[in-house]
Amino acid sequence: MSAHIINGTEIAAAIREEIRSEVTALKAKHGIVPGLATVLVGDDPASHSYVDSKIKMCQNLGIYSEHHPLPQSATNEDLLTLIARLNADPKISGILVQVPLPVQISENLVLNAINPDKDVDGFHPVNVGRMCLGEPCFLPCTPHGVQELLIRSGIKIEGTHVVIVGRSNLVGKPLANILLQKAPGANATVTICHSGTKNLPLITSQADILVSAMGKPKFITADMVRQGAVVIDVGTTCIGYTPEGKRILSGDVDFEAVKEKAFAITPVPKGVGPMTIIMLMLNTLTAAKRAAGLVK
């Protein structure tokens, strides 16, 4: 029997409507409009595409947006000056600096300059620390999206063994911290695997929930998955192009084989991807409410 397909596009659409209603109510009751500033350095086509999608989503939800493009030759000082201005701008609830950045720019220096209260990507050390302590913070968008996918799909997390393959600062590490918390939608036993892990299939096959975030197409095969497990595929790799020039994407999981063994599985595309941008919008809304003293 084939697995239940967890449709991230549908779940993200439901959250989008919830956010739209909140944005409308926030404006009507308090005269507050959430605002997102995006900063893009250089002309990388993929980065342009990502930023464009975020701007369009803001427009769709009634969130004010500003875009600040900078040339490839921009310096640390250029970015720090811009971020200081955005930090001080009351119209801006959240600031997003699109990464990767050119080699001459210190990513840590720039991201750490963002006011933690406007760090809607959840990358600032203050937010990372709050996340680890289980305090109110902005959760990184992709890990938060994974948690929401599980919760809204009715999949129990509490008490389960979650195995995460990948230890990046963007996905693996924060997701482990999120799911470890003694809180609803968490409280799992978490194992992290990585390039130095020995006997990887032995560990992954013990998972109730298996999350792969490596960027290695079809690396997770059916023999690495326990019968009846939930499989979340965060990996997204371009493996080619259609004759029309559209990207062909592959996840980390051998989807066709694994879906015959799993209880539930996310596809690529239309799985985790749509959740990332909607979590960014949710963080921007939350930032606006916090700035107004409406939530903690």
Curated annotation (Swiss-Prot):
E.C. designation(s): 1.5.1.5, 3.5.4.9
Cited Pfam families: THF_DHG_CYH, THF_DHG_CYH_C
A Gene Ontology molecular function term of the record: methylenetetrahydrofolate dehydrogenase (NADP+) activity
Biological or metabolic pathway of the protein: One-carbon metabolism; tetrahydrofolate interconversion
Keywords carried by this UniProt record: Amino-acid biosynthesis, Histidine biosynthesis, Hydrolase, Methionine biosynthesis, Multifunctional enzyme, NADP, One-carbon metabolism, Oxidoreductase, Purine biosynthesis
Keyword Oxidoreductase carried by entry: yes
Binding site for NADP(+): G166, R167, S168, S195, T236
Source domain of life: Bacteria
Subunit structure: Homodimer.
Stored HAMAP family: THF_DHG_CYH
Protein role: Catalyzes the oxidation of 5,10-methylenetetrahydrofolate to 5,10-methenyltetrahydrofolate and then the hydrolysis of 5,10-methenyltetrahydrofolate to 10-formyltetrahydrofolate.
Protein's name in the database: Bifunctional protein FolD
Native source organism of the sequence: Dehalococcoides mccartyi (strain ATCC BAA-2266 / KCTC 15142 / 195) (Dehalococcoides ethenogenes (strain 195))
Name of the gene this protein is made from: folD1
